[in-house]
């Protein structure tokens, strides 16, 4: 019950933050949708945070213009590094896939910010 309350509070804070109301970018919208999906998956705060990170990465990739181009370049590099790290960790193809997803999302967010 406590984890669910914390997760709902986290999503609420994201949804009603000043940045999300002022002019939500695709990255912000993706983070909100991902956080909501993570909450609905029943994994508590961990699911909310993972969902928000992946959603923000997908949102950053779909941005238009220069920010989107930089996000896509960052996602490519991040996915490559993540896949290699996943294989080297000894988890085989499953580790490579997880590493590519997480690395791609992180790389997209960082690429968009730069």
UniProtKB/Swiss-Prot annotation:
Sequence similarity = Belongs to the UPF0757 family.
Q: Which gene encodes it?
A: ymgG
What's the name of the protein?
A: UPF0757 protein YmgG
**Record-linked Pfam families:** Gly-zipper_OmpA
The organism that produces this protein has a lineage beginning with: Bacteria, Pseudomonadati, Pseudomonadota, Gammaproteobacteria, Enterobacterales
């Amino acid at each position: 019950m406590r984890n669910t309350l914390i997760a709902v509070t986290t999503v609420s804070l994201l949804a009603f933050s000043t940045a999300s109301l002022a002019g939500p970018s695709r990255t912000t919208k993706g983070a909100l949708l991902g956080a909501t999906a993570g909450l609905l998956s029943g994994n508590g705060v961990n699911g909310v945070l993972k969902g928000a990170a992946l959603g923000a990465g997908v949102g950053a990739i779909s941005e238009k213009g220069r920010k989107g181009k930089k996000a896509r370049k960052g996602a490519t590099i991040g996915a490559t590094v993540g896949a290699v790290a996943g294989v080297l960790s000894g988890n085989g193809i499953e580790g490579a896939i997880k590493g590519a997803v997480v690395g791609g999302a992180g790389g997209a967010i960082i690429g968009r910010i730069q």
